[in-house]
Amino acid sequence: MMMMKWIISILTMSIMPVLAYSSSIFRFHSEDVELCYGHLYFDRIYNVVNIKYNPHIPYRYNFINRTLTVDELDDNVFFTHGYFLKHKYGSLNPSLIVSLSGNLKYNDIQCSVNVSCLIKNLATSTSTILTSKHKTYSLHRSTCITIIGYDSIIWYKDINDKYNGIYDFTAICMLIASTLIVTIYVFKKIKMNS
């Protein structure tokens, strides 16, 4: 019975690093997805298209730089809004790149928006893509205010030869170290009891 408890303890300690690794990646996704939400203001006055996007930037990030490109073809407006962020207490290099791109189609009474957002985390080599299709909003005095929401979310790990497998290697090392520590402890306890 005592040996069974020790075996369960060893297995529990062996699985902990792997669970900690996977939960940290999940926390990254759930916290940083909020970077893609905000309000998109579209205004067309005197044949001039103005697009303004106010992103939600959490307190843990510092803003570095921003780009905005707008192209128009007939009643379609294509835009890309990118911004670079760094962790407040991290290095001076950008740690996140967020790119919001979309297609806005308008007529006299409404506008239809297709939006996609890419979050690229340079520290963990992970990317998140959020997409939204055919959201329709009313035009008020040639202004369309859209509240950005998404239909689908895709997470994936980037393939980077320089850092490929570094987090997996760390999790495996923690697994081996914790298994060795628990095994040595069990053998010492068995030796003391006999």
Swiss-Prot record:
Residues 187-194 are cytoplasmic. The chain crosses the membrane at residues 166-186. It comes from the Viruses. The keyword Signal applies. It is found in: Host membrane; Host cell surface. Residues 1-22 form the signal peptide. It holds the Pfam family Orthopox_A43R. Residues 23-165 are extracellular. GO terms for cellular component: host cell membrane; host cell surface; membrane. Induction: Expressed in the late phase of the viral replicative cycle. Glycans are attached at residues 65, 114. It is a single-pass type I membrane protein. Keywords: Glycoprotein, Host membrane, Late protein, Membrane, Signal, Transmembrane, Transmembrane helix. Its main location: host cell. Belongs to the orthopoxvirus OPG172 protein family. This is Protein A43. The lineage of its organism: Viruses, Varidnaviria, Bamfordvirae, Nucleocytoviricota, Pokkesviricetes.
